[in-house]
Amino acid sequence: MRQQQEADVVALGRKPGLLCVPERFRAMDLPMAAADALFLWAETPTRPLHVGALAVLSQPDNGTGRYLRKVFSAAVARQQVAPWWRRRPHRSLTSLGQWSWRTETEVDLDYHVRLSALPPRAGTAELWALVSELHAGMLDRSRPLWQVDLIEGLPGGRCAVYVKVHHALADGVSVMRLLQRIVTADPHQRQMPTLWEVPAQASVAKHTAPRGSSRPLTLAKGVLGQARGVPGMVRVVADTTWRAAQCRSGPLTLAAPHTPLNEPIAGARSVAGCSFPIERLRQVAEHADATINDVVLAMCGGALRAYLISRGALPGAPLIAMVPVSLRDTAVIDVFGQGPGNKIGTLMCSLATHLASPVERLSAIRASMRDGKAAIAGRSRNQALAMSALGAAPLALAMALGRVPAPLRPPNVTISNVPGPQGALYWNGARLDALYLLSAPVDGAALNITCSGTNEQITFGLTGCRRAVPALSILTDQLAHELELLVGVSEAGPGTRLRRIAGRR
């Protein structure tokens, strides 16, 4: 392994060794938030808890095939690592076993920054296979908890950059914000910093970005301290729980059916992604009097229905998705909007997988989301957050305990939207073609779907346990198929019945 790392180092045009940072950054311990430490306590080799991002880049017109390799090499030669990227977890007897952050004075960039190359004539499948391997392993806790891989050999001379960061250090939104700080709308700008050279702003370092979509532990923990909302919360949760138990749906459902998606996970990962023009989703949304997020959920519901049918595992009851919502105005977090701070909760939405018609499914999902938002619209933020925490409790307990305690029934899948940058963006002249966010499956929730909007397209990043959710490419193919069916209905005009176009599945 070390020989391979040194070969990659030579390929990047530098000598193996340690990067020494200024003496003023001598080792020091910084407090770690309890919610972040939970991700270290809960992590195991079969349950690594890091997030990732995959950026696909087109090299500038005047760039050579190894243009980005040269840019990376020049960045390493600058020997600059921002303090936030030098943090590693540390605990000792003096800290009574509690986790803290230690700022390293020496950072081994030969280890953290790597070069990979796809085989000749490789395509998208080979790229995702490589990223699946990169995303599977745990990060080394004796080092700062991040890794960057430059991947060469994509069709058309393109490259990809895979970033891996531990969930204790950052979540998907934080990674997105960091990435936004190193790109520009100017295709001619050069000498731009790499990710590890950029200091984290307070909003990133302190984790004030929206996190409810992927941090059920944080969500549940934060609610327990909101004592002012407890009296009203008891009545609200009791009412919501009763309705959820009666109708098998609602913002706090207790009736998610068991599927292969809810099995205990193993260490191997499978990741996949796809992207679509946002205008096609807008077309469907306008035709159906729905939101873009409703269309996203309908696509996911249809894809999961087809996937489970292919495995003979579709339950009679509809699948339930955990979906982030803004508690500021009860609006679903929009991939093409701005995040509303940390006022984030979750709704449990029926994906209507018991319905064969995509049109009927979209209508049911639209109604489910509207009912969920209406249920929390009249509540205080603390009460709504408490409701969200109870809905997310099964996944939080699964993450902490390594299993889902009976008789809790967690949602079948988490589907989250992370706001992304708009317009054409560049890094040192290389155009950002797509950006996929990857998450961390946990026991009881073996599949995570994270959507993001970039440059008038929406990307779907799917992260799953390879054993529980094999062949993720089936899901990406079905996402495209579901969108085509919905677009076909919107183009056929009002009142068109989908069964006449696509038949009944």
Swiss-Prot record:
Domain of life the protein comes from: Bacteria
Instruction: Describe how expression is induced or repressed.
Output: Induced in response to low levels of nitric oxide (NO).
> Which EC class does it fall in?
transferase
* Entry annotation: catalytic residues: 167 (proton acceptor)
Molecular functions (GO terms)? diacylglycerol O-acyltransferase activity; O-acyltransferase activity
Query: What are the annotated GO cellular component locations?
Result: peptidoglycan-based cell wall; plasma membrane
* UniProt keywords, alphabetically: Acyltransferase, Glycerol metabolism, Lipid biosynthesis, Lipid metabolism, Transferase
Instruction: Provide the catalytic activity annotation.
Output: an acyl-CoA + a 1,2-diacyl-sn-glycerol = a triacyl-sn-glycerol + CoA
State which pathway it belongs to. Answer: Glycerolipid metabolism; triacylglycerol biosynthesis
Q: What is its EC number?
A: 2.3.1.20
The chain's coiled-coil residues are none
The reply to whether Acyltransferase figures as a keyword in the UniProt entry is yes
- Name its GO BP terms in alphabetical order: biological process involved in interaction with host; glycerol metabolic process; response to hypoxia; response to nitric oxide; triglyceride biosynthetic process
* One Pfam family recorded for the sequence: WS_DGAT_cat
Please name the PANTHER family in this protein's record.
Answer: O-ACYLTRANSFERASE (WSD1-LIKE) FAMILY PROTEIN (PTHR31650), WAX ESTER SYNTHASE_DIACYLGLYCEROL ACYLTRANSFERASE 4-RELATED (PTHR31650:SF1)
Q: Which family does it belong to?
A: Belongs to the long-chain O-acyltransferase family.
Q: What is known about what this protein does?
A: Upon expression in E.coli functions very weakly as a triacylglycerol synthase, making triacylglycerol (TG) from diolein and long-chain fatty acyl-CoA. Has no wax synthase activity.
- Protein name per UniProt: Putative diacyglycerol O-acyltransferase Rv0895
Organism source for this protein? Mycobacterium tuberculosis (strain ATCC 25618 / H37Rv)
